[in-house]
């Protein structure tokens, strides 16, 4: 079914855009949480494929992203204050607003994979009625708690030096600009995303993609990472929830597979019982936009059927 654009309003009557790809009698509900410097409409093909299996799909444009960011005149900037808390609350509010009565799976990509983990933690902390039946985490990874603390400090210094809403060359070099280093020759600064040149071209030409996040957004993200990997917060999550990692073994965000394995092992060591991982040879950061996307989507469908049966 064609996607429908919908709008939620916050207390200040600011627009929060989200999309729903509905089906008549949904067996499953997949809520997609997109990554940094992109937007929900990029998941249209994935949503349409899931619809074929009677899976209803929702996805929002986060604060600072897509139509939400454009309407707030704050592209690539979460908020002047408490940005991480706000984007997590937005997800919980959006999910809670829906009157959908079937098992809910959250599929988070990159930034969205970490948001998905924190959404689970906050659902438990706030004791909401939202029940999540599983997670699919795409384009994720883990480094170390001390590195996240250092990066948060660097972002704090850059806020002082450049301003809250400004971008930072230093933060860009430590993140997006470094991701292309393992690829040669390169056509664009975004070749690390996919081997599919047409998909990279679409991303580069999309005004709602690829912008440098603000210093405050980086600070908020690092604050979020420190929250997620806090052992007390990890223990809030039901250890029986199925969590499935998917990643390209040439994804720099996942350290070519090593960072994803590290994340998986961290969860297993924390007592999680159903953690699985699928690495795709030669694939890069955006699996659903890479050359193996048909295989990736088919595998996600198989995983969904398996856990729900």
Regions found by a protein language model. Name each.
Residues 108-112, 116:
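Gly/Ala-rich beta-loop-alpha elbow adjacent to hydrolase catalytic centers
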Residues 34-38, 110, 249-250:
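Active-site glycine-rich loops that stabilize anionic/oxyanionic intermediates
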Residues 78-97:
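Alpha/beta-hydrolase active-site loop
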Residues 47-73:
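Conserved alpha/beta-hydrolase
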């Amino acid at each position: 079914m064609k996607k429908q654009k919908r709008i939620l309003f916050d207390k200040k009557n600011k627009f929060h855009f989200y999309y729903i790809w509905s089906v008549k009698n949904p067996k499953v509900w997949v809520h997609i949480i997109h990554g940094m410097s992109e937007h929900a409409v990029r998941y249209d093909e994935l949503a349409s494929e899931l619809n074929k299996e009677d899976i209803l799909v929702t996805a929002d444009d986060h604060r600072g992203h897509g139509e939400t960011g454009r309407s707030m005149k704050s592209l690539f900037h979460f908020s002047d204050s408490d940005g991480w808390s706000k984007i997590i609350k937005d997800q919980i509010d959006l999910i809670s607003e829906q009157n959908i009565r079937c098992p809910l799976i959250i599929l988070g990509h990159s930034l969205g994979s970490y948001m998905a983990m924190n959404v689970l933690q906050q659902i438990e902390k706030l004791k909401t009625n939202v029940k999540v039946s599983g997670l699919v985490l795409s384009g994720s990874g883990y480094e170390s708690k001390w590195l996240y603390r250092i990066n948060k400090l660097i972002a704090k210094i850059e806020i002082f030096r450049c301003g809250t809403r400004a971008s930072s060359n230093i933060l860009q070099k430590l993140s997006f600009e470094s991701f292309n280093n393992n690829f040669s020759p390169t056509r664009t600064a975004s070749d690390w995303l996919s081997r599919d040149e047409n998909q990279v071209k679409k991303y580069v030409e999309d005004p709602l993609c690829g912008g440098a996040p603000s210093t405050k957004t980086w600070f908020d993200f690092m604050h979020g990472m420190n929250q997620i990997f806090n052992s007390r917060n990890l223990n809030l999550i039901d250890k029986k929830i199925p969590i499935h990692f998917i990643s390209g073994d040439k994804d720099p965000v996942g350290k070519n597979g090593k960072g994803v394995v590290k994340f998986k092992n961290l969860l297993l060591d924390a007592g999680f019982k159903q953690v699985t991982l699928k690495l795709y040879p030669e694939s890069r950061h955006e699996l659903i936009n890479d050359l193996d996307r048909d295989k990736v989507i088919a595998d996600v469908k198989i995983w969904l059927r398996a856990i729900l049966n």
